[in-house]
């Protein structure tokens, strides 16, 4: 009987399942996702690993950060739903492996091939061709990568309709040569209309609708907002405090035609450049295009770029911003800002939303992120945690998420690049 009891106890013990620690569970999920992505890359040769990670919008926090601290700050949990959806979206938009390999340039003459190829080169848009399209139709498309940005040009006889699947944090500039483009923003319910010889900027937000008229010809310049932000701050030495907007503008005029000519020349030169010269040439053209964009186009940041002001802002708002710049390393509340501006908190919030497109605290956050970026680039940052705490970010993990959202890479990566550049210069 004693033997049976011991065996029974052993059986019960063997059937008990030990719970998996939370940190190990998070690590297992991340490892499983990485393995799945690598398998997809190996099994599908045209798949670009960098494009996959960009599509997943991963935030890779420094490996030196303890996993417990990452889990405690919970930035990863907030990302899991979007990671899952983005993975499904990316896989769903892949063409079949039975189909011939597609390049970034194509010419299609049937409705089905037009949709298939557009879905391959522009996967964030759900494309449709007008039902009135005749059997004899055509679409010629070419895309040219310019580092983190890219150029896309097209000429087509069909009417195209598209629905954006998700937010991409891209700013797109559409130059319409012939035809017409309309983009409707789902959030603001406003429609941007771009007629021939005009250019305007638009954001790829989930639910946005785009209609491109038949017999249209256009050039698009797509760039991450983080790259636009870095360029603006590097050129002006001031923080990028609100979203960039370029209204519909005629680009055939002499003073604003330079950007279009630069992009066309970049398209030609990069298409014929040798592989060794491509990175340096792309970097030069990207910098030149952004300088011309900021200095010659009538965007909403033009006055701030040229004169160091952000328009005729109220005196109270300017006082609040001056107080922000003087107290980047000190705790600041909305009441402190209102007292410095000598107005009520509600009035101050209303002024910031009108003239800065955001709340006072979001503008203060942008100032602090810009200060962190400047400290990292100048080599003044000892550690990311110390830098975050010094600038009043109580959660280093959250600081990493905000920094990457603003500048396109994690602060630890930016710090590592700065140190590597410094060591190369010393050598």
Curated annotation (Swiss-Prot):
**Where do the HTH araC/xylS-type domain residues begin and end?**
318-417
SUPFAM superfamilies per the record?
Homeodomain-like
| UniProt keyword annotations, A-Z | DNA-binding, Membrane, Plasmid, Transcription, Transcription regulation, Transmembrane, Transmembrane helix
Record bears the keyword Transcription: yes
Q: Which PROSITE patterns match?
A: HTH_ARAC_FAMILY_1, HTH_ARAC_FAMILY_2
Choose one Gene Ontology CC annotation of this protein and give it.
Answer: membrane
Compartment(s) of residence: Membrane
One of the Pfam families matching this protein, by short name: HTH_18
**According to Swiss-Prot or TrEMBL, what is its membrane topology?**
Single-pass membrane protein
What Gene Ontology terms describe what this protein does at the molecular function level? DNA-binding transcription factor activity; sequence-specific DNA binding
Residues within the DNA-binding region(s): 335-356, 384-407
**Spans traversing the lipid bilayer:** 25-45
What PANTHER family does the record tag this protein with?
Answer: HTH-TYPE DNA-BINDING TRANSCRIPTIONAL ACTIVATOR EUTR, HTH-TYPE TRANSCRIPTIONAL ACTIVATOR RHAS-RELATED
Q: What is this protein called?
A: Uncharacterized HTH-type transcriptional regulator y4fK
Q: Which organism is it from?
A: Sinorhizobium fredii (strain NBRC 101917 / NGR234)
């Amino acid at each position: 009987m004693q033997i049976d009891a011991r065996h029974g106890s052993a059986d019960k013990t063997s059937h008990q399942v030990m719970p998996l620690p939370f940190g190990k569970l998070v690590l297992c999920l991340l490892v499983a996702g990485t393995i799945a992505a690598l398998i997809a890359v190996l099994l599908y040769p045209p798949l670009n690993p960098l494009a996959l990670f960009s599509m997943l919008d991963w935030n890779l926090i420094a490996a030196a950060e303890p996993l417990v601290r990452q889990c405690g700050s919970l930035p990863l949990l907030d990302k899991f739903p979007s990671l899952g959806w983005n993975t499904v979206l990316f896989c769903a938009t892949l063409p079949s492996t039975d189909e011939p390999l597609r390049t970034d340039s194509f010419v299609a003459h049937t409705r089905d091939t037009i949709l298939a190829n557009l879905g391959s080169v522009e996967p964030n848009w759900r494309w449709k061709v007008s039902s009135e399209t005749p059997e004899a139709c055509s679409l010629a498309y070419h895309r040219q990568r310019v580092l983190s940005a890219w150029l896309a040009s097209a000429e087509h006889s069909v009417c195209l309709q598209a629905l954006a699947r998700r937010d991409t944090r891209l700013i797109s500039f559409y130059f319409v040569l012939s035809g017409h483009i309309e983009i409707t923003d789902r959030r603001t319910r406003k429609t941007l209309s771009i007629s021939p010889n005009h250019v305007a900027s638009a954001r790829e937000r989930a639910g946005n609708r785009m209609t491109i008229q038949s017999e249209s010809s256009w050039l698009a310049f797509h760039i991450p907002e983080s790259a636009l932000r870095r360029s603006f701050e590097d050129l002006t030495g001031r923080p990028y405090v609100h979203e960039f907007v370029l209204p519909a503008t005629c680009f055939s005029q002499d003073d604003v035609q330079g950007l279009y000519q630069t992009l066309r020349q970049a398209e030609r030169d990069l298409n014929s450049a040798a592989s060794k010269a491509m990175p340096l040439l792309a970097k030069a053209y990207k910098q030149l295009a952004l300088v011309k964009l900021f200095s010659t186009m009538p965007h909403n940041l033009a006055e701030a770029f040229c004169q160091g002001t952000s328009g005729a802002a109220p005196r109270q708002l300017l006082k609040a911003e001056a107080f922000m710049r003087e107290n980047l390393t000190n705790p600041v509340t909305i009441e402190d800002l209102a007292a410095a501006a000598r107005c009520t908190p509600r009035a101050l919030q209303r002024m910031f939303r009108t003239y800065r497109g955001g709340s006072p605290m979001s503008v203060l956050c942008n100032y602090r992120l810009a200060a962190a970026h400047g400290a990292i680039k100048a080599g003044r940052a000892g550690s990311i945690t110390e830098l975050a705490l010094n600038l009043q970010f109580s959660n280093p993990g959250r600081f990493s998420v905000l920094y990457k959202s603003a500048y396109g890479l994690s602060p630890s990566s930016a710090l590592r690049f700065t140190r590597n550049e410094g060591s190369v210069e010393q050598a």
